[in-house]
Amino acid sequence: MIKKIGVLTSGGDAPGMNAAIRGVVRTALSEGLEVFGVYDGYLGLYEGRIEKLDRSSVSDVINKGGTFLGSARFPEFKQVEVREKAIENLKKHGIDALVVIGGDGSYMGAKKLTEMGYPCIGLPGTIDNDIAGTDYTVGYLSALNTVIDAIDRLRDTSSSHQRISIVEIMGRHCGDLTLMSAIAGGCEYIITPETGLDKDKLISNIQDGIAKGKKHAIIALTELMMDANELARDIEAATGRETRATVLGHIQRGGRPTAFDRVLASRMGNYAVHLLLEGHGGRCVGIVKEQLVHHDIIDAIENMKRPVRNDLYKVAEELF
């Protein structure tokens, strides 16, 4: 029977992680459990930086971005001896189970711990929205608002200077954040892992727009696909129109979470605790059609590539 649980955040931070921690802590305490926070993710678990949390530990955090527990990337956690040390630290505190908030790398760690006898529940916290088995990850819609704000500002200055702007947006192998940002921001062109890039066609379309009197253009580009500055130079050379690249970078991860993310994170945190109380381990939570669901964490890892949103790409194609 579970009496003590731990909670940690791992990998890249996302707005709403604090709300998720709060959901876990408050629910666990309401159910008569003791709760421990692990600082700086799996690194802190390995180093034994674990502290008991109470209701006041999560007061006034629901509106704050980032994660007060801290986060860190710790690839060494793949090593068996490192995980054994982490488990030793869990045992010192009598922790029976763990809620892991993060992305795909965090899920892999949770899977490994579950296989070694420590039941874990994964909670999707990443702005990339690249986790299978959930319509939304915690932090995604908050990041979307941040990107839209940046695009709106870039459109103002691009219009003033008759400039083409390339906006590089996070997402890694998933174009969801770029796609939604492009539609909501009224971007003229979109380049994601799902669309790929036909550079000649892109330049031809831009030239057609200029010939029709288009004064500026915004191109939404998913990170890691290509060098945004190099693409800007190629477009400027071909069109004669000033072209600049803006890499939004880590600003997308910061800021206060939206109301949606606060509610989503709270619901998921609550649900994760109840799954542990029901005896589940090696599962991950999600939300599908507004309903909370849970899946085998292995399925989420092996099917990390989310289905392509062909319906939204069709909308984007007709609007651009």
Curated annotation (Swiss-Prot):
The entry's localization annotation reads: Cytoplasm
Query: Assembly and partners?
Result: Homotetramer.
Q: Which residues bind ATP?
A: G12, R73, F74, G103, D104, G105, S106
- Cofactors: Mg(2+)
**Descriptive protein name:** ATP-dependent 6-phosphofructokinase
Swiss-Prot/TrEMBL GO biological process terms = canonical glycolysis; fructose 1,6-bisphosphate metabolic process; fructose 6-phosphate metabolic process
What do the Gene Ontology cellular component annotations say? 6-phosphofructokinase complex
Which residues does the annotation say bind Mg(2+)? D104
Q: Which residues cross the membrane?
A: none
Annotated binding of substrate, by residue: T126, I127, D128, R163, M170, G171, R172, E223, R244, H250, I251, Q252, R253
EC number from the UniProt entry = 2.7.1.11
Q: Which GO terms describe its molecular function?
A: 6-phosphofructokinase activity; AMP binding; ATP binding; fructose-6-phosphate binding; identical protein binding; metal ion binding; monosaccharide binding
**Pathway(s) where this gene product acts:** Carbohydrate degradation; glycolysis; D-glyceraldehyde 3-phosphate and glycerone phosphate from D-glucose: step 3/4
In the UniProt record, the gene name given for this protein reads pfkA
Keyword annotations for this protein, in alphabetical order, are: Allosteric enzyme, ATP-binding, Cytoplasm, Glycolysis, Kinase, Magnesium, Metal-binding, Nucleotide-binding, Transferase
Q: Provide the active-site residues from the annotation.
A: D128
Organism of origin: Vibrio parahaemolyticus serotype O3:K6 (strain RIMD 2210633)
